[in-house]
A protein has these predicted regions:
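Intrinsically disordered, low-complexity, basic-enriched segments
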Residues: 1-82
Length: 82
């Protein structure tokens, strides 16, 4: 997917969360992207951030940076021994 499309989509998510309480905006954006974006889309937007992230609204940029800095932990490969 082209970066401009991802930027548009991410900013649309951000616009939705603008109506939430201020302390819920960035976490809400991050949670939505984490839950509903394919890992390839997330990796592409992370690379876009690394390249400057032009065009991303400030709360969207912050949410993506938070996601990038705190990667998901999958329990699929973790040891669950007793």
């Amino acid at each position: 997917m082209k970066p401009d499309r991802l930027v548009y989509m991410a900013n649309q998510i951000g616009k939705f969360f603008e109506s939430q309480r201020a302390d819920e905006v960035v976490p809400g954006i991050a949670d939505h992207i984490k839950k509903f974006w394919d890992p390839r889309m997330r990796n592409a937007i992370f690379a876009y951030i690394d390249a400057g992230g032009d065009g991303l609204d400030p709360p969207v940029r912050e949410a993506i940076v938070r996601l990038k800095e705190k990667p998901e932990h999958s329990t699929a490969t973790s040891f669950q021994g007793t």
